[in-house]
């Protein structure tokens, strides 16, 4: 897998936890850098109001199918399992109470639980 951002780490963790052998490659010296700076350092980690109509796609069935399999509520359940405190800012926008680093650490822990191998920084 290429890229240790939110999507890359989530995908790598899921694949690893399903028994796949995963190598996650990141070119930057820190993983989850965009997560770390999002929301002013508090990480707007999901939006409970986001549905298929919120996304532009050539194939609207893809988004419907993807969100039916793993949506904002699923990610929120993961956040809560890891004990990350959060609050709703407005219209379903969920932010960490403290720091976005909690989400980065959570995703890293999920990857480790799945046995994901890491290569970083990778030129």
Predicted segments, located by residue:
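Mobile, glycine/GP-rich and aromatic-enriched active-site lid/loop segments adjacent to catalytic centers
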Residues: 81-106
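A conserved short coil-to-beta-strand element within the FAD-binding core of flavoproteins
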Residues: 120-123
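Short N-terminal binding/cap micro-motifs at the start of the first secondary-structure element
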Residues: 8-10, 31-34
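Conserved beta-strand segments of alpha/beta enzyme cores
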Residues: 21, 85, 115-117
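Glycine-rich active-site loop/strand segments that organize a redox cofactor
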Residues: 40-90
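N-terminal Rossmann-like FAD-binding beta1-loop-alpha1 element of flavoenzymes
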Residues: 1-24
